[in-house]
């Protein structure tokens, strides 16, 4: 047995040495490469953070990180699909992509992503694997994307205006009736607007188990009927009587600050802190959620199969997982995006820093529906309410 243990230990050391050697080869190959990182560019705090990442990659890794700021990640997905259709198997225009679950599913099912690389990154050892880092919208990731940050649908209110917020869908409806014109949500297919529909669906449907699989027509009609009944009652009491909707959460923030709205929505539980720090929301702003829970997920970066700078893209993804990068990202004065690292896996000083930057008193996290529900919900919403 002693010899067995010795042999296993030797094999483990050999494996670690091999892995370190492989990673050094990747870093060597990455030097001088240019990475085109396609990411949503709709938030100045995120843009500033990515500019900092760019500088770090140049200084410490000799990698040229170019940020392509997107209005919608679907634009990059279409480019990847077009390149694949044209037979462009190498030299693709996208090296790294900040992706949501719906777009991940689209690319993965078409075999347009590299797989099996995420858990080989050296900084994976710090990841909190209790988070849903191995599936995305109920789709197994299979190492095809690396976690970057946590997220949870979150309401924002002002304590001087709304000291007691609604904590159930029914309470939200009563709140809207009592305060007509001061409640709304972003127009789907805005990501946060669609997440709001998913949140209501989870809480209103009599068959939440059906949300774990992609719907067929009959299932969709049956499961979503309570959602449309709820919205039909809610909409007349919304901002502009539900005949128009803000295009984005940023517009809702501005309307909340102006006093037009009583509630805003975000998919970042630290968003209110960050916007208070930047002066974009009043100091009385606070976050809250429904008592039973709010949907949450992990957001990821992925590498297309035809990426031109695959090695450098992996080095960037690994840096994004580093304690220094995650701590900076979690700082509300910088971005305020929740970390995907486990504080217990970090050295003492970093552990305490990360714990101090983790949002407190959050409601339970509810799992998102299967990615197959997203487009179906958006199309039905547009059919019912999008032509006003």
Curated annotation (Swiss-Prot):
GO annotation, cellular component aspect: ATP-binding cassette (ABC) transporter complex, substrate-binding subunit-containing; membrane; outer membrane-bounded periplasmic space
Domain of life of the source: Bacteria
InterPro entries, per database record: SBP, YnjB
Region (Disordered): 333-357
Gene3D superfamilies: Periplasmic binding protein-like II
Example of a GO biological process term: transmembrane transport
The protein, known as: Protein YnjB
Organism encoding this protein: Escherichia coli (strain K12)
């Amino acid at each position: 047995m002693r010899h067995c243990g010795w042999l296993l230990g030797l094999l483990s050391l050999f494996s670690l040495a091999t892995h370190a050697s492989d990673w050094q080869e990747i870093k060597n190959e990455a030097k001088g490469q240019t990475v085109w990182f396609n990411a949503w560019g709709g938030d100045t705090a995120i843009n500033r953070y990515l500019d900092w990442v760019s500088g770090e990659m140049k200084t410490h890794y000799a990698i040229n990180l170019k940020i392509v700021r997107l209005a919608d990640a679907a634009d990059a997905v279409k480019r990847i699909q077009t390149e694949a259709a044209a037979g462009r198997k190498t030299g693709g225009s996208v090296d790294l992509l900040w992706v949501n679950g719906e777009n991940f599913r689209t690319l993965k099912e078409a075999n347009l992503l590299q797989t099996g690389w995420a858990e080989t990154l050296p900084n994976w050892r710090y990841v909190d694997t209790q988070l849903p880092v191995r599936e995305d919208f109920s789709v197994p990731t299979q190492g095809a994307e690396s976690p970057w940050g946590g997220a949870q649908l979150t309401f924002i209110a002002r304590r001087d205006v709304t000291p007691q917020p609604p904590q159930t869908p029914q309470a939200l409806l009563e709140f809207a009736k009592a305060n007509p014109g001061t409640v709304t949500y972003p127009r789907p297919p805005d990501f946060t607007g669609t997440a709001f529909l998913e949140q209501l669906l989870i809480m209103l449907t009599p068959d939440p188990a059906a949300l774990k699989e992609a719907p067929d027509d009959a299932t969709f009609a049956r499961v979503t009927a309570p959602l449309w009944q709820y919205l039909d009652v809610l909409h007349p009491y919304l901002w502009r009587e539900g005949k128009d909707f803000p295009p984005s959460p940023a517009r809702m923030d501005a309307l909340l600050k102006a006093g037009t709205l009583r509630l805003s929505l975000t998919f970042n539980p630290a968003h209110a802190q960050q916007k208070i720090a930047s002066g974009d929301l009043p100091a009385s702003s606070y976050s809250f959620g429904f008592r039973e829970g709010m949907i949450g997920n992990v957001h990821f970066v992925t590498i297309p199969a035809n990426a031109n700078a695959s090695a450098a893209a992996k080095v960037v993804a690994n840096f994004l997982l580093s304690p220094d990068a995650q701590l900076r990202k979690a700082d509300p004065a910088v971005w305020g995006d929740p970390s995907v690292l486990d504080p217990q896996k970090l050295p003492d000083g970093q552990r305490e820093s990360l714990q101090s930057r983790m949002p407190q008193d959050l409601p339970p996290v509810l799992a998102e529906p299967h990615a197959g529900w997203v487009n179906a919900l958006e199309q039905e919403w547009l059919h019912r309410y999008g032509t006003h």
